[in-house]
């Protein structure tokens, strides 16, 4: 190559060298980020490894946790979690029909706790009752599969021992999952998929909650009444109260946030809750909520949380909760959710 040709080609060579350097640097940065992402994904899918994790007060005196996600979640909630409600609604069942009593409690544990296991995966929840969530210990794959496995076993058992209860269980699962599906579609597609406004929007949300949460408590009544409908209204209303209580505590309870490991988890996940729907119907708070749902920027989320804490939104939510609990005082006391909420003066 002549010196003249080299001088002409030199700028191009420099540009190529610069491009190669930039590509190499970009590759290294991308590789590092991808590696970190792969590690994070591995934890999500396969967990931290429960053998290396100990939790004081769980799984025995040696602090080792149970060897399966379902047993772990039971250790957090306690076996036969619905026993106080069952004994309150049907005081003689345990004495008269011990096998049916045992089956009903196992069904309710399976439905409630397996749905919690999957819900925590969907929400990327770090904590449950101030302990690490199951999917972070065992991985999302094993946790979800165990939930399906436990539910399948209890369905099969119910169909063999009490076919009427098995049919009620299947019916309830379909309705619960329909409600959960509505909630997930709203979260996936954002506020554009939630096209209701005003009172209609509150009714739309309530319909979802009655499916997702109300059905759980209606199922308990159906199981206790051998498929009878006589407790549907009472326990459906209680289910709506329980959902409202959970939604409000997600925003207004510091104790609840501590136990969950995050404040306003619903808002951070772009998930609709009753306070969010109320705020969307208030012209003073709607812009902050919509901005947070669109951007997921921490600053926007903070401003949206402040909007949810505004007296107009908070008072509406807590008043609705109080009204929903009228006539349910005994059930509320037996269910025993103790986290305190801070009230607007």
UniProtKB/Swiss-Prot annotation:
Gene Ontology BP, a term: alcohol biosynthetic process
Q: Which UniProt keywords apply?
A: Glycoprotein, Magnesium, Metal-binding, Transferase
Q: What is its EC number?
A: 2.5.1.-
Q: Which residues of the sequence carry a binding annotation for substrate?
A: 112, 128, 212-213, 243, 250, 260
Residues that, per the record, bind Mg(2+) 2: 119, 123
Where does the UniProt entry place glycosylation sites? 130
The answer on whether this UniProt entry bears the keyword Magnesium reads yes
User: In which domain of life is the source organism classified?
Assistant: Eukaryota
| Cofactor: how bound | Binds 3 Mg(2+) ions per subunit.
- Please name the Pfam families in this protein's record: polyprenyl_synt
* GO terms for MF: metal ion binding; prenyltransferase activity
Q: Which Gene3D superfamilies match?
A: Farnesyl Diphosphate Synthase
Cofactor(s) needed by this chain: Mg(2+)
Under InterPro entries, the record lists:
Isoprenoid_synthase_dom_sf (IPR008949), Polyprenyl_synt (IPR000092)
What does the record note about the induction of this protein? Expression is down-regulated when the stress-activated mitogen-activated protein kinase (sakA) is deleted.
Family the entry assigns: Belongs to the FPP/GGPP synthase family.
Instruction: State its role.
Output: Prenyltransferase; part of the gene cluster that mediates the biosynthesis of lolitrems, indole-diterpene mycotoxins that are potent tremorgens in mammals, and are synthesized by clavicipitaceous fungal endophytes in association with their grass hosts. The geranylgeranyl diphosphate (GGPP) synthase ltmG is proposed to catalyze the first step in lolitrem biosynthesis. LtmG catalyzes a series of iterative condensations of isopentenyl diphosphate (IPP) with dimethylallyl diphosphate (DMAPP), geranyl diphosphate (GPP), and farnesyl diphosphate (FPP), to form GGPP.
What protein name applies here? Prenyltransferase ltmC
Q: What is the lineage of its organism?
A: Eukaryota, Fungi, Dikarya, Ascomycota, Pezizomycotina
